[in-house]
């Protein structure tokens, strides 16, 4: 995978990148709203959207959010959202390479930990995260103004 590049998501790559998440989760993103909100998201230093490109094709996506803690040592921590690899490119270490990028970013910021949520039915994702050293904790999610997943 020498041709694999992990980089910050660019506006011109939005549709291709978001399509991976939408396809993996059988969703439809509101692109009009996304394009209107993108500059606000892109310019927020606490948001870091990345893509994995293989031969200039987007094959992975992740949103990394810096959270600023107010207790103990006041170290920041990261949350990872919207993580996904295109189904045709899984089991090729692309997700692992993306997480290596995330680890380097966390170390640069001197983060205390990284948190993420895997949907309860996403057994493949859970096994992948466990293979990277993550362990299960109890987490809760409340959807606001939406139907249950």
Enumerate the predicted regions with their spans.
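Conserved GNAT acetyl-CoA-binding A-motif
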Residues: 99, 106-117
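Conserved beta-strand-loop-alpha-helix junction that forms the acyl-donor binding cleft
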Residues: 115-125, 143-147
């Amino acid at each position: 995978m020498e041709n694999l590049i992990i980089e910050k998501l660019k506006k011109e790559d939005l549709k291709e990148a978001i399509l991976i998440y939408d396809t993996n989760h059988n969703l439809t993103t509101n692109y009009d709203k996304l394009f209107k909100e993108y500059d606000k998201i892109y310019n927020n230093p606490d948001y870091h959207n990345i893509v994995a490109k293989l031969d200039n094709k987007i094959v992975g996506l992740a949103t990394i959010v810096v959270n600023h803690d107010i207790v103990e040592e006041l170290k920041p921590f990261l949350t990872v959202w919207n993580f996904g690899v295109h189904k045709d490119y899984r089991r090729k270490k692309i997700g692992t390479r993306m997480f290596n990028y995330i680890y380097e970013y966390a170390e640069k910021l001197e983060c205390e930990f990284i948190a993420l949520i895997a949907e309860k039915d996403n057994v493949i994702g859970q096994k992948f995260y466990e293979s990277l050293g993550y362990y299960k904790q109890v987490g809760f999610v409340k959807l606001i103004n939406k139907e249950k997943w």
